[in-house]
Regions:
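Structural preference for solvent-exposed beta-strand-turn elements
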Residues: 1-200
Length: 200
């Protein structure tokens, strides 16, 4: 289950939910996600020890490079987001991050015609995530579910997301849903671990 006090997982989700929303908000710094979101066109400025998130500052570069450090959550969150707000990009991985599994995304990206190229410690995705009906396994990291829950509301058109049983990290999925709802993004439960997600 997730931590009871706001820690890095909650802060990262706060940053992601605000990055492409209009307006300004103060949030704690989350370095890897800030770098990646800036590459995708989100605007930030620093004030004291926090970030002022200004919302989308412009279009993402055609093929942005996003340094994920050694953070598996950053990589898994940013992959679908980059395909939603742009045409993908190149993800730089450090340490053992390149060994972390990413296969749960494969059927989704293949259905959208997304290409994936791996060279050493870099992974390049090219294409566009599309609204649709998607399924993810629940017996792997909830980070894949979080990535899709953040990306799908950014697309034109409505989507559904289903997580198959058993669901191992339910608390973290609930944390993501709470952050989305606090940001005014509607995610409607239509069944056990199944949601209807309106697009833009």
């Amino acid at each position: 289950s997730p931590p009871h006090r706001p820690g890095i997982p909650h802060r990262g989700r706060q940053l992601l939910r605000q990055a492409f929303q209009p307006g300004h908000v103060l949030l704690p710094k989350v370095a890897q996600q800030q770098r990646c979101l800036r590459a995708l066109g989100a605007g930030f400025r620093e004030q004291d020890e926090k970030l002022v998130v200004c919302g989308a500052a412009g279009d993402a570069a055609d093929a942005p490079t996003m340094d994920c450090g050694e953070s598996g959550s950053t990589l898994r969150f940013m992959m679908p987001i980059a395909l939603a707000v742009g045409q993908g990009g190149t993800f730089v991985m450090h340490g053992r991050l390149a060994e972390r599994p990413l296969e749960p995304y494969d059927p989704i990206f293949e259905a959208c015609g997304v290409t994936r190229t791996r060279e050493g410690n870099t992974l390049t995705l090219r294409g566009k995530l599309k609204a649709g009906d998607y399924t993810l396994p629940g017996n792997v990291s909830s980070q894949f579910v979080t990535g899709m829950l953040y990306a799908l509301p950014l697309l034109p058109g409505d989507s559904t997301l289903t997580v198959t049983l058993p669901v191992e990290s339910a608390g973290y999925i609930d944390m993501t849903l709470q952050c989305l709802r606090e940001s005014g993004i509607r995610v409607e439960s239509i069944g056990d671990w199944q949601w209807h997600i309106p697009g833009e």
